[in-house]
């Protein structure tokens, strides 16, 4: 390969620079504090997504419950999605589901 930098080398270098120069560390600490406070106050964490992001939301919900001990939920049940979409419109189903299930102290 020699001393030539490859596309991948440059890409990784760019990512490192962007991470170092970003607010990622500060934001991660703030997010961790939010999660800890939610857990201490018996709050829940709701994950939501559309399409493939619904799978990510489902996976994150399990990870946060299992690994962090924070009760986490997602709205990936077909009957809930179709019921709320039918009654309130597809563009409103998540909002309406949160209005029904979210309690004070929960985070989304």
PLM feature spans:
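Glycine-rich, small/polar surface segments that engage phosphate groups of diverse ligands
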Residues: 34-107
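A short, well-structured juxtamembrane/interface segment
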Residues: 20-41
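Short, functional N-terminal and low-complexity linear motifs
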Residues: 1-4, 29, 60-66
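Generic N-terminal amphipathic, Lys/Arg-enriched alpha-helix
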Residues: 1-23
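Short, structured helix-loop boundary elements
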Residues: 5, 25-28, 91
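Hydrophobic packing residues in well-ordered alpha-helices of helical domains and bundles
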Residues: 8, 28-31, 57
């Amino acid at each position: 390969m020699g001393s030539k930098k490859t596309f991948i080398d440059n890409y990784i270098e760019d990512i490192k620079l962007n991470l170092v120069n970003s607010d990622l560390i500060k934001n991660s600490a703030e997010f961790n504090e939010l999660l800890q406070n939610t857990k201490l106050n018996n709050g829940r964490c709701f994950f939501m997504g559309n399409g493939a992001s619904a799978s990510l939301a489902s996976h994150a919900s399990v990870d946060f419950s299992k690994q962090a001990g924070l009760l986490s939920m997602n709205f990936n049940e077909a009957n809930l999605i179709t019921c709320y979409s039918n009654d309130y419109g597809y563009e409103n189903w998540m909002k309406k589901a949160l209005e029904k299930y979210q309690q004070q102290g929960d985070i989304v």
